[in-house]
């Protein structure tokens, strides 16, 4: 299997014969993700990795995750995604203000996927009290500070404009960023940006311009 392009390319990165590996255009993501975990490995302190898209719009810069890797994340996976997003946003010299999204607001639905998101938020707030993160919440409350502050004045995000959106699963993340892309083709999207692997392995799709 070493002659398969993903294994060969990633082994070159792992052994120092290449600085980075770009993949995904002609291979299945599921296979590429498996090889990346096996050959490159995940950064210490994490059990999962993910990807982020950056949206540069007239309204500002937004960071969206996870847009490619984790199909049905559980609470532990969402925690890792949130931690990786925080780290990545800071790398780009922004202060993360994180909303963890759902169709439910702050425990209103006590079943299904909102419970996973709520659990991730509770953990993050307990372990990282200095971090501006809250949820679970609907995207309209995440994006509208005045509406959010009026309806939910108790949030840790009071008075803050959200710039980082963590989606509850891959379906919502993929649909969300591609909907924004389709509605305004002039808006600049950067990504997917890999978060959490030990070395630079980057994924592309058919819409990639570079």
Describe the role of every protein-language-model region.
Residues 1-210:
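Anion-binding alpha/beta catalytic cores of soluble intermediary-metabolism enzymes, centered on
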């Amino acid at each position: 299997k070493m002659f398969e392009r993903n294994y060969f390319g990633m082994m070159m990165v792992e052994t120092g014969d290449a600085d980075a590996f770009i993949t995904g255009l002609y291979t299945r993501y599921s296979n590429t993700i498996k090889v990346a975990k096996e050959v490159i490995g995940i950064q210490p302190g994490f059990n999962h990795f993910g990807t982020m898209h950056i949206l540069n719009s007239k309204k500002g810069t937004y960071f969206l995750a996870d847009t490619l890797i984790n199909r049905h994340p559980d609470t532990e996976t969402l925690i890792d995604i949130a931690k990786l997003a925080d780290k990545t946003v800071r790398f780009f010299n922004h202060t993360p203000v994180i909303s963890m999204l759902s169709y439910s607001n702050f425990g209103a639905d006590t079943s299904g996927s909102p419970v996973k998101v709520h659990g991730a938020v509770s953990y993050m707030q307990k372990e990282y009290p200095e971090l501006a993160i809250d949820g679970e919440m609907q995207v309209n409350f995440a994006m509208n500070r005045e509406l959010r502050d009026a309806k939910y004045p108790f949030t840790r995000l009071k008075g803050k404009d959200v710039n980082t959106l963590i989606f509850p699963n891959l379906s919502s993340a993929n649909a969300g960023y591609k909907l924004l892309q389709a509605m305004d083709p002039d808006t600049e999207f950067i990504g997917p940006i890999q978060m959490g692997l030990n070395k630079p392995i980057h994924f592309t799709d058919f819409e990639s311009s570079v």
